[in-house]
Amino acid sequence: MAVDLNQLVDEIRGTVQNLIANCGRRGVEMRPNAGLRTPFDQARLWRQSRTTEEIVEKIDDLKTAGADFLAFCLESVGPQHGAPVTNALPGFSWHQWGEALDCFWVVDGRAEWSTVKKVNGLNGYHVYAEEAEELELTAGGHWTTLKDWPHVQMRAASSPGRIMSINQIDEGMRARFG
């Protein structure tokens, strides 16, 4: 999947281009596969692996908090199935703000998802995380819970919810995607 890096905010766009180039200089090809993500796409990812009860409870919580657009995003995408991939609700991932990028490692022309496999003594995801931090990005592979090796983001704050109120997030998502 081609990712349009121009959809990322200016402050991260050049940095992630440098990140990919720096990895390449170390013999590691990293290819972008997720940049800007709509809150509807985030809702699909969050819903997979969760029970109906958990989903209904979270929709109710969002409505009670006055975050009607976020609740609508979560409710409107319908049932989703799959392994857990995120704890971030719609609006609560930096992807929705254009401040995060996911890349996969390319080995012999194929996507390689292993975080332990080494080629020429290097694991692509570990190189990617190291290089990201050299550029003052936050690397998801170094998180303590639900490690997300393909993910890098501009801010150190793990979530927009750490620096914005739920109402600010709801308003921001409605303005961008509503």
Question: Where are the regions a protein language model picked out?
Answer:
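Cell-envelope/glycan interface and biosynthesis
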Residues: 1-166, 170-178
